[in-house]
Each structure stands twice: as C-alpha cells, then as structure tokens.
Design a protein with these regions (language model features):
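N-terminal binding-site loop/beta-alpha segment at the start of enzyme catalytic domains
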Residues: 1-82
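Conserved, mostly hydrophobic/aromatic
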Residues: 6, 18, 55, 70, ...
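Aromatic-lined glycan-binding groove of carbohydrate-active enzymes
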Residues: 194-232, 267
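Terminal-tail/helix-coil boundary detector
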Residues: 204, 228-263, 278-282, 296-349
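Short, well-ordered coil/turn segments that N-cap beta-strands
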Residues: 11-16, 51-53, 78-82, 119-123, ...
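Glycine-rich beta-alpha junction loops
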Residues: 88-90, 161, 187-191, 213-220, ...
C-alpha cells in the first residue's frame, strides 16, 4: 500500500480508503447495503491488514448507524493508527436548523459524530455538500473553532464546484483560518467532469482528492454488460447515483476494462481503480461493498500499475470533450500552459 500526503498537510493516507455507506442499512441507505456489526468488523480488519489507514463515513449514512457501527468496531481505540473521516451538512431531523453548514448545525453535528464514533477527535471533518444560504465566513469560522478546540484535526469539502472551493480558500486566507486540505469528489472513467476544474484546482492549490464511488456504483466492476444488469445491484434497487447520460460510451469503457483485465489476469474493477490511483491529483479512492470478496478484489488494485499503452486505450474511449474555454486555450494558449492546465489539455497538445 502506498501512502500520500493529504493536500497541503503532513498527514499521509493510504491510496485506498475504506468507505462505509453500505454499513447500517437504515432508511434509503438500505438500497445501497445492509452491512451489520459482525460483517463491518471483518471488513475493517481486512482493510487495515491490507494497509488502509483511513475510514470514511458520514452522519447521514443510515441516520448515524454507520458511524455508530464504526465506533463499536474500533471500540474507542484506534487500531493500527487508523484515521477517521466523517461529514456533515444534510438534514438529520425535521427542524429548520437540522441541516446546512451553519455554525449551529456543524458544531452540534460534530459533537454528535464524536459520540457515535466513540472518539475524542475526528481526523478529517468534511462539509458534505454546498450550502448556498450560509455565509462561507460562518462555515469556515465554525470549522476553525472545531480545530482549535481539538475536536477536529483537518477539514475538507465534498461535492463543491470550482468556484465554491476557490471562494472557501480565499475566505480562509483572508481571515487567517483553517483551510480545506482535501476535497471528496465523484470521478471515474465514465465521469471525468472533474478534470475541467476540480482536478486542476487540486494540483494548483495543493488539495488532496478523495474519490467517492470510483466504480460508478458498480457499473465499472465488469458485472454490468450490454443488456445485462445482475440481480441485487443498487441500480435495480432504485439508487440512481451516479446518473449515466451516454450508455453507449459507458459500454465502450466497460468493454475496454474487460479486455485489459483479461490480458492482465485481474478484474475490471481493479483496472478501473488502478487508473484512478495513477491519475495526477488523486490521493485516495474510497471503496465499499456488501460482500467480503468485493473488498478483497478492490484492495488488490493498490498494487496494480497500468502501462502507458493501457492508459491510452482507456483514454481513447473515455476522454471528456474539450469544452469552452478550454478549446480556446488549446488553440491560443498552449505555448504557456501550466501543470494544472495540462492535467486536462495534455492529451490534446
């Protein structure tokens, strides 16, 4: 297992993170998974034995049950120096202040997460989604308070747009407050929109990148083929995240993953994960599952290195279109492109 610095921090995290959205099985999250305590204990040990040192969860996952189970598994102790990341923003109750990124909600939810996780500190506390009604100054100040109180060590964001991130970083700099060290984003061979703004920002601003749903909800695992959706998948259960806008492109990507996997003697899922782990700007990919074999298979991706030729084959079926203003930069600015620019435009120069 390789360990990488998380953004502009001294914290090193494994290139694979254990995700926990399948743990708990409460409410709408039952569509994703129903992993109980005994299974979760086994999966945590499996990940830690493989060298994983970061577990990612959220208060909203199964209405707190995911955090509670992880807290029970860890037993108030940190096995093998494991780091805990969690998130807050979504509504946890019916009241008007039970959601969002206000000082009121963030501080109360952080304290609730600490209790559920049976710990006195959260290593990475992430705002789970944008809140356009709470001033960023208030959100950043609340996070800064939590760090200064010793309840949180590092802060990050999730599902922010490019301008959201840059505004937040500007607020932190202007007010001399804690700064996001990472962003958690959706990024796969099928969904490469992050390459327009989010990956360049990560490179330019030294932000860590944690990738959620790196297999597109299992669509890139190789189990889904043209005209075939296996039983028991989250798509059949009504979980429509992530959206697929071009099915033909998806199947071309899956076909290429299957072909490369067969040539290498590995699984398509391992190829898809290895592609991400090897992408510039990516710090760690978050894996999850309902079965032990899913974890075992995904963990093996940590040691798989794709060749340049294999990467070119995957690019050929998945490169995102060069939209404005990038096509104009490609035409008129390619003599002075920087490292962050080339993360998107490099294949076209």
């Amino acid at each position: 297992m390789e360990y990488r610095l998380l953004g502009r921090s001294g914290l090193k995290v494994s290139t694979i993170t254990m995700g926990t959205m399948t743990i708990g099985g409460e409410g709408k999250f039952a569509q994703v998974g129903n992993v109980g305590l005994d299974e979760a204990r086994r999966y945590v040990d499996l990940c830690l034995d493989a060298g994983v040192n970061l577990i990612d969860t959220a208060n909203i996952y199964s209405a707190g049950a995911s955090e509670e189970i992880i807290g029970e598994v860890l037993g108030g102790k940190r096995k093998n120096g494991v780091l805990i990341a969690t998130k807050a923003r979504f509504s946890m109750g019916p009241g008007p202040n039970d959601g969002g990124l206000s000082r009121h909600h963030l501080i109360s939810e952080c304290e609730a997460s600490l209790k559920r996780l049976k710990t006195d500190v959260i290593d990475l506390y992430q705002v789970h989604q944008w809140d356009g009604q709470t001033p960023l100054e208030e959100t950043i100040a609340a996070l800064d308070t939590l760090v200064n109180q010793g309840k949180v060590r590092y802060i990050g964001c999730s599902n922010y747009s490019g301008w959201h991130i840059m505004k937040a970083l500007g607020v932190s700099a202007h007010e001399h407050r804690q700064r996001f060290v990472s962003q958690q984003i959706h990024y796969t061979l099928e969904a490469r929109e992050a390459e327009y703004e989010l990956i360049p920002i990560a490179i330019d601003q030294s932000l860590g990148v944690l990738v959620w749903s790196p297999l597109a909800g299992g669509l890139l695992s190789g189990k889904h083929r043209r005209g075939q959706t296996p039983e028991g998948t989250r798509q059949l259960a009504g979980w429509n995240e992530p959206p697929i806008r071009d099915e033909e492109r998806l199947w071309k990507i899956v076909d290429m993953l299957v072909a490369i996997a067969a040539e290498r003697g590995v699984s398509p899922a391992q190829v898809a994960l290895a592609w991400l782990i090897g992408r510039k700007g990516v710090t760690s990919v978050i894996i999850g599952g309902r079965k032990e074999e899913q974890f075992r298979d995904n963990l093996a991706a940590a040691s798989l290195k794709l060749t340049e030729e294999e990467r070119e084959l995957l690019d050929a079926v998945s490169l995102p279109p060069v939209i404005y203003p990038y096509w104009h930069q490609l035409w008129t600015a390619k003599d002075r492109l920087g490292e962050a620019d080339l993360s998107l435009l490099g294949p076209h120069v």
